[in-house]
């Protein structure tokens, strides 16, 4: 499942994103954030973090630097 999400994001980055002007108000961009979150936390938690990030991407949020959280050491 993790690989399917990664493929979907890579498809978006390669074929859809170049057609739109750059509008992401965050660094890293939402798609890069999603890739890193899914690679670090897996499909469920990484997908949750990605959706949460995308929901913050609107004109009323200041944006800025918003990295993927570090994985907690047990």
UniProtKB/Swiss-Prot annotation:
Species classification: Bacteria, Bacillati, Bacillota, Bacilli, Bacillales
Gene Ontology CC entries for this record: plasma membrane
Superkingdom of the source species: Bacteria
Subcellular location: Cell membrane
Biological source species: Anoxybacillus flavithermus (strain DSM 21510 / WK1)
Family under the similarity heading: Belongs to the UPF0161 family.
Keywords assigned by UniProt, alphabetized: Cell membrane, Membrane
Protein name in UniProt: Putative membrane protein insertion efficiency factor
Function: Could be involved in insertion of integral membrane proteins into the membrane.
NCBIfam families: membrane protein insertion efficiency factor YidD
Topology class, membrane: Peripheral membrane protein
InterPro entries, alphabetized: Membr_insert_effic_factor_YidD
Keyword DNA-binding (UniProt): no
């Amino acid at each position: 499942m993790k690989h399917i999400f990664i493929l979907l994001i890579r498809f978006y980055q390669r074929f859809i994103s170049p057609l739109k002007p750059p509008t992401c108000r965050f660094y890293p961009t939402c798609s890069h954030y999603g890739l890193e979150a899914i690679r670090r936390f897996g499909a469920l938690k990484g997908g949750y973090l990605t959706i949460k990030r995308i929901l913050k991407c609107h004109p009323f949020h200041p944006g800025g630097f918003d990295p993927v959280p570090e994985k907690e050491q047990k």
